Amino acid sequence: MSNDKSYCGFIAIVGRPNVGKSTLLNKLLGQKISITSRKAQTTRHRIVGIHTEGAYQAIYVDTPGLHMEEKRAINRLMNKAASSSIGDVELVIFVVEGTRWTPDDEMVLNKLRDGKAPVILAVNKVDNVQEKADLLPHLQFLASQMNFLDIVPISAETGLNVDTIAAIVRKHLPEATHHFPEDYITDRSQRFMASEIIREKLMRFLGAELPYSVTVEIERFVSNERGGYDINGLILVEREGQKKMVIGNKGAKIKTIGIEARKDMQEMFEAPVHLELWVKVKSGWADDERALRSLGYVDDL
């Protein structure tokens, strides 16, 4: 008699900004769908990553980092997106960084204590901990904070113990029909993924120079007769000086960003891509909830 049981559930990946949530998601999926950079607050939307293996389907929600600073409209909305992800999942992966513990970590923990879902604590970047003797006392301190389902020291970057996290997730998926076909890796549209790729390259090549007041709008995304895609991306900044920074000397910076973004798009979409980028000043958008709604920042709240 064949066993036709299937298992499926939602898992939220939460934590303060820049602890490695997106890197962990990409590692769990075996490919990149969530943008990563060393700059905090890179993830702005909840990304759904789907991993299907045989009878098991894990649907991961990669939340923006929760943080205490809520002054700007964009930060308020990002915190709301992250908090709402915690409420409707079967399991939570709480990511913290090595032996660091901050008020933002404490704030996330307090939200999790109020929740019903079991929590796996993923202690990331353990390979970067200089004093290994500090690790065990810190893990004991963390264990005393909450009744975690499990505590797993990991390195999302190298993949250390990520398979352990995946095994714990699989073991706790409820019996349910799969929500997505087995070949799906995300429920986000190609248009959305294109904007995320461009935004990652902006973060990568402009780094600390560029404030968070930059976003990307895909104005055109069409199939062409060559079997590929024609994509027009609009980069929105808040000030004229930022526009010059993005364009670079004689257009060198935006050219590099475009070349690297196109490479990633072609790999993701498995088709040729013709990409054109423009930069436009739209002052105050990060403070304007209406502007944020028009850019899709509240479609998932």
Curated annotation (Swiss-Prot):
<dbReference type="GO" id="GO:0000028">
    <property type="term" value="P:ribosomal small subunit assembly"/>
</dbReference>
<feature type="region of interest" description="G4">
    <location>
        <begin position="124"/>
        <end position="127"/>
    </location>
</feature>
<dbReference type="InterPro" id="IPR009019">
    <property type="entry name" value="KH_sf_prok-type"/>
</dbReference>
<feature type="binding site">
    <location>
        <begin position="15"/>
        <end position="22"/>
    </location>
    <ligand>
        <name>GTP</name>
    </ligand>
</feature>
<keyword id="KW-0690">Ribosome biogenesis</keyword>
<dbReference type="GO" id="GO:0005886">
    <property type="term" value="C:plasma membrane"/>
</dbReference>
<dbReference type="GO" id="GO:0070181">
    <property type="term" value="F:small ribosomal subunit rRNA binding"/>
</dbReference>
<comment type="function">
    <text>An essential GTPase that binds both GDP and GTP, with rapid nucleotide exchange. Plays a role in 16S rRNA processing and 30S ribosomal subunit biogenesis and possibly also in cell cycle regulation and energy metabolism.</text>
</comment>
<keyword id="KW-0699">rRNA-binding</keyword>
<dbReference type="InterPro" id="IPR027417">
    <property type="entry name" value="P-loop_NTPase"/>
</dbReference>
<dbReference type="GO" id="GO:0005525">
    <property type="term" value="F:GTP binding"/>
</dbReference>
<comment type="similarity">
    <text>Belongs to the TRAFAC class TrmE-Era-EngA-EngB-Septin-like GTPase superfamily. Era GTPase family.</text>
</comment>
<keyword id="KW-0472">Membrane</keyword>
<feature type="binding site">
    <location>
        <begin position="124"/>
        <end position="127"/>
    </location>
    <ligand>
        <name>GTP</name>
    </ligand>
</feature>
<dbReference type="Pfam" id="PF07650">
    <property type="entry name" value="KH_2"/>
</dbReference>
<dbReference type="InterPro" id="IPR005662">
    <property type="entry name" value="GTPase_Era-like"/>
</dbReference>
<feature type="region of interest" description="G1">
    <location>
        <begin position="15"/>
        <end position="22"/>
    </location>
</feature>
<dbReference type="InterPro" id="IPR005225">
    <property type="entry name" value="Small_GTP-bd"/>
</dbReference>
<dbReference type="GO" id="GO:0005829">
    <property type="term" value="C:cytosol"/>
</dbReference>
<feature type="domain" description="KH type-2">
    <location>
        <begin position="206"/>
        <end position="283"/>
    </location>
</feature>
<keyword id="KW-0997">Cell inner membrane</keyword>
<feature type="domain" description="Era-type G">
    <location>
        <begin position="7"/>
        <end position="175"/>
    </location>
</feature>
<protein>
    <recommendedName>
        <fullName>GTPase Era</fullName>
    </recommendedName>
</protein>
<comment type="subunit">
    <text>Monomer.</text>
</comment>
<feature type="region of interest" description="G5">
    <location>
        <begin position="154"/>
        <end position="156"/>
    </location>
</feature>
<keyword id="KW-0963">Cytoplasm</keyword>
<dbReference type="Pfam" id="PF01926">
    <property type="entry name" value="MMR_HSR1"/>
</dbReference>
<dbReference type="InterPro" id="IPR006073">
    <property type="entry name" value="GTP-bd"/>
</dbReference>
<keyword id="KW-0694">RNA-binding</keyword>
<dbReference type="InterPro" id="IPR015946">
    <property type="entry name" value="KH_dom-like_a/b"/>
</dbReference>
<keyword id="KW-0342">GTP-binding</keyword>
<feature type="region of interest" description="G2">
    <location>
        <begin position="41"/>
        <end position="45"/>
    </location>
</feature>
<feature type="region of interest" description="G3">
    <location>
        <begin position="62"/>
        <end position="65"/>
    </location>
</feature>
<feature type="binding site">
    <location>
        <begin position="62"/>
        <end position="66"/>
    </location>
    <ligand>
        <name>GTP</name>
    </ligand>
</feature>
<dbReference type="GO" id="GO:0043024">
    <property type="term" value="F:ribosomal small subunit binding"/>
</dbReference>
<keyword id="KW-0547">Nucleotide-binding</keyword>
<dbReference type="InterPro" id="IPR030388">
    <property type="entry name" value="G_ERA_dom"/>
</dbReference>
<dbReference type="GO" id="GO:0003924">
    <property type="term" value="F:GTPase activity"/>
</dbReference>
<keyword id="KW-1003">Cell membrane</keyword>
<dbReference type="InterPro" id="IPR004044">
    <property type="entry name" value="KH_dom_type_2"/>
</dbReference>
